[in-house]
Structures are given as C-alpha cells and as structure tokens.
C-alpha cells in the first residue's frame, strides 16, 4: 500500500518557530561586531543622501532604565528604516558627563577633602565607568551605532568646542553678567537652569501683613477724600514669610480697583475683588465700611513703613499683580523674585539681598542672622505679630519649585551670575527670543502639539543662567576685571587660545592655567580668571556644534532630535538657544520628535516603592530584546507608554504570529532557487499575482508612510494584520493545497513559491528596523548568507504591474474574499454540531450579485480551492447568500478533499483523480487559485 504522505511537499523550515531570543541574541551581537557591520554599512552607504539623527546624550550615572530603552529603540528604528530607504544614516551615540550628580557620587565614594584637580580626575573616571555600563546595555538592545567612537561631553575636543560655542554667543552680544534672582538650590549650593526645576506640592505658611502708610493725607487724595482719620494700612499676602526682611516695596496693579475700608484694625487698602475673602480671614464681620474706591495707578509712589523693620517702602505699579488670590497688593523683594526684580529695576530701586549662598541670613539681619530661611520662617511670623501688623496666618498647599536632583524646595536668590539674555538685542539687532520663536516656526514637530508647547516655553522663559559655582564642568574661560567685573577686551581671542589648550589637555588646562601665560603683566594686575563652570545644559545644548558640525560623517543641521517630552524645556530648548544665539542663527534641527514617559498598566509612574519598575535588563533576559523593541514600536509613543509582564506577554503573541508566518514561508521556499525556479509574472497563477499586490501595498504603506512619519505603532499593526489576515487567514490557507499536493517543480507550485519569495524578502526588510535580531536571522536564510546584512539592502523591488490590471485584479479578489468569508460563516454551524470536521468536508452553493457571480464563475473548477471547500456552485441573485452542506463525496487520503472520483484511476484506489495525476502523471495545471 502506497504511503502518500511521502508524495506531498512537506518541507522542514530552516527558520524555527521558537525564537529563543534571550539566549541567541548575544551571539548574534558578537558576530555582527566581529564582522564590523556598522563600518561596512558606512562604506556601502557612502555617497547616498544623508539623514542625521543627533543623539541627545543620557547622563553618565547609573544603569539605564526603561525610559532610556524606549528612547534608544525608537532612534534605532529610525536609523535602520532610513538606511533601508536609501539614506546614509550614521548614528553617533553620546553621553552627558559633567555636573553635580557625578560630583555627589564622587564625594560619597571618596569624600570631599582632596585637591580640586584630583576631584575632577575622579569625576572623569567615574563617568567613564558609568558609560561603559550603559553602553553594554544599549548594545544589548540591538542599537546600531558607532559604539567604539561615541561622543562624550568630557572629551577634550568636545570641551574645547563647548568653550568655542561660549565664544560664539559672546561675540553675538547675548552674554551678560547681572545680579538677578535665580532659582537656587541650597543643597547644590548653586543656581539652577529652568530645566533642572520640577514642581511638586508643598505646604507653606500663608500670612496677611499690614504695611502702615506714612502719609494719610496723600492716601486720602489718592482715594478722592478730604482726609483720613486714624491709621491706614496696605495689606499684602505672601506664602514666603522668609522674604519679608528683603521687602523693599509693595506693588499694586495699575488697572486694579482698590477699596479703602474702615475696619476695627484701622483703614485697610484691599483689591475690590478680594476684599470680602480677606476680611473674613481677619475675622472682621462687624464695624466695616467701604469709604472709597480708586485704581492702582493713583496709589503709585505713596510710602509706607516696613511692618517690622525701619525701612521706607514705596508703592509701585507692577504688571505681575493679579486678583487671583491674596489681597491684590504684593510685597516686593527684588532679591527673591524675577517679577519683583523687574519692577524694582524699572523704578531704580537698589537690590538688597540678606540671604547668603548657604541660604542663611547675613549677620546684619536682625533676629534671624545665621539662620537658614526655612528655620527663620516661624521667627519671622512672630515679628509682625509683635508689631500688631499680622492680620492672618494659615497653612496652604501649593505647587512649588523643587530641585530635580535633591527633591528639596528652591529659593529665588539674587546672585552675580552670567546670563544669555532673551530680550537683549544681539550684534545683529535681533533678540534671542524673536530668533528662537521663528526657529520654532521653521521646525516640524512629531506629534504636532510639540510646537505650541515649545513656543509657549520660549515665549515665557527668563534669561538663561549659564554659570555655575561647581568644579566638575566646562569652565567659563573668561578673564574678568577685578573692580568693574567687565570681561577682558580681547576675550574672543583669549577664548580661542584657551580652547586650543583644552583640546590638548582637557578642562584641567584652564584650572591649572597661570593667567600670566596668556595675559601681560599689567593685565594680570587687573584681571582674574573666572572660577565658574557652565550649566551642563550648555554642554549638551552645544553638541550640535561640538559634535554634529565637527564630525566628518555628520551634517549640520541635524534632520532630527528625538527625546522624551521633558526635553521641551531641556535639551530641545538649550540646543535651540545656542543655535540661534551663535553665528548659525537657527535651530540645529529640522524635526523634533517627542515621546512620552513609561508607566505601568494602571498608568502609574515607575517607582521602586510601589514595586512596579520594569527594568530593560529583566525584559531582554527573559523575553529577548526583540520583544522589548516590538513593545516600544507597537505603543503609541505620543502619550504615556504602558508596560507590564502581562502587556509583554501580549506583545509576545504578536511576535509569535510574525515568526510563525516567516517559519511557514521559509519551509515552503527551502527547495526554491529564485534564479532557476522563478515564474514570470505574466505566467503566474492569478491569486499569486494578487498576493504580490497586497505585499507591495503593505510595503508602500510602511516604507512610504509609517516609517518616514515615525508612526511605528501603525506599522506594527499593519504587519501583524498582514501576517494574520492577508496571509494566514486567506492566501496561505488557500495556498497549502497547491504547495503540498502539486508536483514539486510544476508551474503551479513554482508560481506560488515565486510569490512567497517576493513576499518574504519584502516582509523581512519591513520588520528588520523593529525586530533587528529576527530580521537578521531571517536574512541569513533569504539574503546573501552570514556576511550579508538586511541593512545592506533597500526596500524590496516587486515585479511591475499595469495599474489598470492591478485595479481589476484587486476588485475581483476582494469580491472573492467577501464570498469566502460568507462561505466560512455558513460552514461554521456545521462544524459546531460536528456535521463536518473541516471546511473541505463541505460543499457550498453561493447566490451572488451578477458581478460577484461572474468573478466566482471565472475560476471554474478552481473556485473550490479559493473557497476551501470540496465543491462549489454559483448562481446569480440579488444579494450574497450561502447554503452549505456536508459533502457526499469520499475523502482523498492525499489531499483530504471529498470527491466522487476517489479510486477512479487504477492503482490509486485511495486518492482522487487530481492526486493520481500529480503523483503519477504530468501534474495538474492551475490558472487562478
């Protein structure tokens, strides 16, 4: 008896269904590194148009977290997809190496008691150790880049070019020194840039304090009264009592309506809109009378006494005064608030700062000298109470600025700092703010809402404090006049000389420099080296100049910057400002892409205390990096990205669908040689030509749309849908009969394999930017072997097809698919009640509208293959309907179809006539399915 199972084309797949990624990925990485894949790619891509994604440098401290992984994976998908789209897309990874967090770690490890040069040396060593750890993890994610030659902000050349960028901004006229209030962290002992500030809720004392008017006659005139009997007070409300010793004025809104109210305390001046709430706070319900009203402009230049110090307090008009809360009058301390500083500066009031760099009151401050501002709060609360000027005291919870590193509250404190001015006219007569806003207009944003966000931040941001009083940072290499504070007149030339030294020896070249090496003896008497270092955001914000402009393989401006949404106020902005403030005069990027933060499945932030942290190391060790990459790509990054074990298991199911599809494709291509066996398109079976159209259209959607627009979640959705619906549930389901049962080298089978070959090559190329390990594993089989790489190839080129013919083909097979779905639905009840086991055990009678019936009948005897039934008949009717029943034929042992011709051919008693022909004759022919 013949064993017909040996006559079917069931081949083993060289692509296993189980990926075993976690174990196999490291070996692939090792092999790619040994083959110098990245370097070979640069040679292959030489001469192509450039695409530059400039890497925003992660900070060189601690292990990478899941947010780092998302960021690097998204960048890698873009680099790979651009490469396959025909660009030369080099990727130079970078690290941010200077700054306080590293100082803090070095102090913890080695203490503080050492020479500063040794301290900086240890900081450099620590940063290098952290970079090595992070680099290993980034490479493990499959991120392709020049890992042997990354950029580091602590590289001597980069440090030198950061100094040169400082020189650019100096020459542009935007740099100035000023004693302005800046956000100051007492734990850092330094000013903070806006990007280093985060807002959290804080409970603060809220007090109403009365300032006695000196001259009630002038006050009466302001309110249009003949006179005022008794005492009168301007009442302020503040949540920072510690600033009261620095109070130098009270501000009123010029257009705000104020009332003079008679109360048991005396006459009080309060904003009309806030008076009722204020009087309730003071417990005044009886004996109240509104005497008069006026506007704030009439109160200007009236004078009061300080509530507990001997100090004259003028009334000013300030644009910052609102009637949202409080009293409508604002106590004004120019040393401790930007708006306070601005209004006092306008009125020529000299700044007084009683708080030192440690956050303690100077010795001249009565009662609180030597106390920290937080310790002094309760003492200061008692002070106006003793003088009878405290009207109310309570607690309030409000959003307050905190240090992003120490999580401690900040203070505004006036210090002598170096600023990049936003509204100062530069050497070209334009302000930096105007230039930056124009640069925003010239930038493309992904997602689009990023434009409004960055624009509003630039419109509202203060001048950029670029100086720091730290040790581990790029120095501000200026010589400053000892008496005037002015910069040396030859600063531009001196900066370049210093930069040349730093290029050779690093920042230590400045710190160890004796000024006599660069200055004349006379200049040495009058000028000192500036001890300040630069804000680390200046370091990273200058990398478009120090890296992109300097490295031969890169081009300025970059095409794309891609970072988390917090970088609108961080790296995106600092890069924008250095680009616009320098001779480049524009943003250093053409596009900005923003991704959200990673949260757990319940939308909560990752937190060790909650126990919901998902570490990338755990994910790639358990699931493989390709699963992490697929998760990152399949999640809409424009919002928060949710991750958990359950979510990753669902992602694994999508991966399995793609992998199983590839395994099937490779099994059925294992005896196919495209050079010898391919069938010309005109000679292909019709459904194979239709499948090629579906595959080509998938490629067009991804290569021509989703990848260039960075819409990776749509790309993943389309790939999975193509594998499960177009291939798995339709084309491959139909194809199995032809692949398995026709003669191995028949046109019918070779036509199918030709289609599968094109589909497989295209599919592997399409998944490769996302599933880089799986893509390369597959390309080893269908490409040029182990030394070849999917990245060495651009998108697949499909056989050309006439547009009109394609449209007709798609229309026809769309109708056939619709009919097939109706047939499948009609058979389902028969399967449910066990009347039939598989659809091949059924017959279908289809009623269809004329056009659809024509398409179905055109397939003739092959219609049953397309519908996966053993027999199909079609008649014309008004609408689609299907009647299904069990076949009365006999099951063919070889093809499993139920027919009435089993055993019709002598010697083939258990198989149908078609199978007898395929086994012993010339083989069947197919035209449609």
Swiss-Prot record:
ATP binds at residue 608. It catalyses: tRNA(Ile) + L-isoleucine + ATP = L-isoleucyl-tRNA(Ile) + AMP + diphosphate. Its main location: cytoplasm. Its cofactor is Zn(2+). SUPFAM superfamilies: Anticodon-binding domain of a subclass of class I aminoacyl-tRNA synthetases, Nucleotidylyl transferase, ValRS/IleRS/LeuRS editing domain. Zn(2+) binds at residues 892, 895, 912, 915. Gene3D superfamilies: 1.10.730.20, HUPs (3.40.50.620), Valyl/Leucyl/Isoleucyl-tRNA synthetase, editing domain (3.90.740.10). Coiled coil: none annotated. The keyword Transport does not apply. Its EC number is 6.1.1.5. A motif ('HIGH' region) lies at residues 58-68. GO terms for biological process: isoleucyl-tRNA aminoacylation. Pfam families: Anticodon_1, tRNA-synt_1, zf-FPG_IleRS. PANTHER family: ISOLEUCINE--TRNA LIGASE, MITOCHONDRIAL, SOLEUCYL-TRNA SYNTHETASE. HAMAP family: Ile_tRNA_synth_type1. NCBIfam families: ileS (TIGR00392). Monomer. This is Isoleucine--tRNA ligase. It comes from Neisseria gonorrhoeae (strain ATCC 700825 / FA 1090).
